Amino acid sequence: MTDEGPSKGGYRRVLLKLGGEMFGGGSVGIDPDVVGTVARQIAEVVADGVEVAIVIGGGNFFRGAELQQRGMERARGDYMAMLGTVMNCLALQDFLEREHGIDTRVMTAITMGQVAEPYIPRRAARHMEKGRVVIFGAGTGMPYFSTDTTAAQRALEIGCEVVLMAKGVDGVYTADPKTTPSATLFETITHREVLERGLKVADATAFSLCMDNQMPILVFNLLTEGNIARAVGGEKIGTLVSTPASGVA
């Protein structure tokens, strides 16, 4: 895997990571307007022949770490959050198929035979080769692992060129721009720098996994219309997080 950015013409196989809290539009549950907007942007890139896999979080329903703070066993809270991710997956699948005619498969790390296929890497890759969008639910199927880590692992296993990490901000900043107005945006940064600076873009496990395997991460603002197509097309938006091929950060 090389990670100096997209080849001419953009990326051809991508893993799109969507935060669950964005699906809720800032509240608990699913906001149909948000899901519809995301589905429309995904349909645009699929129409251009890009192979797309998606990992969705469940933060609009549950967060295991937050439930733990209220006294719940962490593992049980994480399993509840996994179920929340599947609800988000099914919602996105519905919008993609019903409104845009995009053939879609939901694959889960926990067996849910009536609503999704089990996650089998080679089958997922084959679906993508046939032009189907693959949506991964239930995280890794194990507690204590975030959906950011799931995105990194799935991207590596099915041969994606990049993890497109959609956020509610424009990219990676020197500090949280919501609390520090003077924070500045990085156009590029290495995985190691993100970890050493303690920048809260995604969890450290996900970044370490991508760093060790030279998987680039493009962090961009999902709330800007057309940004998914811009990210896939290789336009300079957001922040490209990468590690030189030599492995020296």
UniProtKB/Swiss-Prot annotation:
Taxonomically, the superkingdom here is Bacteria
Q: Give a GO cellular-component term.
A: cytoplasm
| Positions bound to UMP | 58, 78, 140-147
Does the UniProt entry include the keyword Transferase? yes
Q: Name one Pfam family in it.
A: AA_kinase
Q: What class of enzyme is it?
A: transferase
Keywords per UniProt = ATP-binding, Cytoplasm, Kinase, Nucleotide-binding, Pyrimidine biosynthesis, Transferase
Tell me the Gene Ontology biological-process terms attached to this UniProt entry: 'de novo' CTP biosynthetic process; UDP biosynthetic process
Instruction: Report the principal subcellular site.
Output: cytoplasm
Gene3D superfamilies, sorted: Acetylglutamate kinase-like
> Which pathway is this protein engaged in?
Pyrimidine metabolism; CTP biosynthesis via de novo pathway; UDP from UMP (UMPK route): step 1/1
Instruction: Supply the EC number(s).
Output: 2.7.4.22
Binding of ATP, residues: 17-20, 59, 63, 173, 176
Q: What GO MF annotations does this protein's record show?
A: ATP binding; UMP kinase activity
Q: How does it assemble?
A: Homohexamer.
Please explain the role this protein plays, according to its UniProt record. Catalyzes the reversible phosphorylation of UMP to UDP.
The Swiss-Prot or TrEMBL record describes its family as follows:
Belongs to the UMP kinase family.
Task: Please identify the protein, giving its name as recorded.
Answer: Uridylate kinase
